[in-house]
Design a protein with these regions (language model features):
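Active-site-proximal cofactor/substrate-binding loop regions of enzyme domains
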Residues: 56-139
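Basic/polar N-terminal segments that are highly enriched at the extreme N-terminus
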Residues: 55-56, 300
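Bacterial N-terminal signal peptides
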Residues: 40-52
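N-terminal secretory signal peptides that target proteins for export/translocation
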Residues: 1-34
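General secretory precursor processing signal
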Residues: 12, 51, 77-80
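The N-terminal extracellular segments of secreted preproproteins, especially immediately downstream
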Residues: 8, 47, 73-76
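Short, conserved sequence motifs used for protein processing/export or organelle targeting and
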Residues: 114-142, 146-300
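N-terminal export leaders
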Residues: 33-38, 143
Length: 300
């Protein structure tokens, strides 16, 4: 049993009424259907707000990848963004290292506020999960844990169960080394070396590198979150496939990822993960914080 405390550490939940959200849900369902993200009509949404605080951090050897699909245009997302920040900072799961990624989708951008961190590629990534996990629809805020467990980001019991499941799954070794930034800020590149040891296990998996902002903040001027200052953690700027692991094989290779213009090396983290094709299961993950140009701080 994972020692995640969702009791006295849980701050009072803030649930918006069904009446207040009904018009929003209907509009979002129509929007998602038009964009091909709603697989089945008539499926309801659970998008309730909550604020969660978790227990104290603990040393953790097992990496768990936690992806949050979110948007600054969604009024149910700020509490989930806050939860992700707490998971990252407090590391409340003994025996685990939570590696978080905030992935901003773009299907809310037509609803009054364009999220500056949104990406159609990340929308497509969420859509792939809808297919792989047999879901009816994409929605926000949604958590994906280790690529094969999906849950509403406002349900602490589901979050706890997902971490319990993830801790039972063995991971293969992965390492990020010699991570450095090169070039001017307006056209910087991150380079490093990635090694994956699949050992004797059979795998058919893709290897990804994600570059994410450690911290981001926005003043929202329109839309459902109008007037709010929103903060985020590990906001994905780039996510690229750099290789693959097949059958009983290892991977050892240098990688290179071009950063978005203006991205400062001291403001990002580099995340590497190995994801099985078909099932989406994440079998390896690692992260490096980049506190200053040319200096990688290993394994967060």
């Amino acid at each position: 049993m994972v020692g995640v405390i969702f009791g006295e550490w849980l701050l009072p939940s803030v649930f918006s009424s069904i009446h207040d959200h009904r018009h929003r849900v209907v509009r979002l369902k129509r929007m998602l259907k038009q964009r091909g993200l709603l697989a089945t009509s008539g499926v309801g949404f659970m998008m309730c707000s909550f604020v969660a605080g978790l227990g104290q951090s603990a040393a953790a050897p097992t990496p768990i990848l936690v992806e949050l699909f979110t948007s600054e245009g969604c009024s149910s997302c700020p509490p989930a963004d806050a939860l992700l920040q707490k998971l990252d900072a407090l590391q409340p799961v003994p025996g685990a290292r939570l590696i978080v990624l905030s992935e901003h989708v773009d299907y809310w951008d037509q609803e009054g506020w364009k999220d500056q961190y949104s990406s159609h590629e990340l929308t497509n990534r969420q859509k792939s999960y809808v297919s792989e996990l047999g879901l009816a629809t994409a929605y926000t805020p949604q958590l994906i844990v280790d690529g094969n467990v999906e849950l509403h980001a406002n349900d602490p019991q589901q979050v706890q169960s997902a971490f319990e499941k993830a801790l039972k799954d063995a991971k293969i070794p992965i390492s990020l080394d010699s991570v450095n930034f090169e070039g001017p800020e307006e056209a910087a590149t991150v380079r490093g070396h990635l090694q994956v040891d699949a050992g004797s296990e059979n795998h058919n998996a893709d290897i990804y590198i994600a570059v994410a902002l450690n911290h981001a903040e926005s003043q929202v001027l329109r839309g459902e979150n109008q007037g709010q200052t929103l903060t985020h953690v590990a906001v994905v700027q780039e996510m690229v496939k750099v290789g693959k692991v097949q059958k009983k094989g290892n991977f050892s290779q240098d990688f290179e990822v071009k950063l978005k213009p203006g991205t400062k090396p001291g403001e990002v983290r580099i995340v590497a993960f190995v994801q099985e094709r078909g099932s989406g299961k994440v079998v390896a993950a690692a992260s490096v914080l980049q506190n200053q140009p040319g200096t990688g701080i290993a394994s967060r």
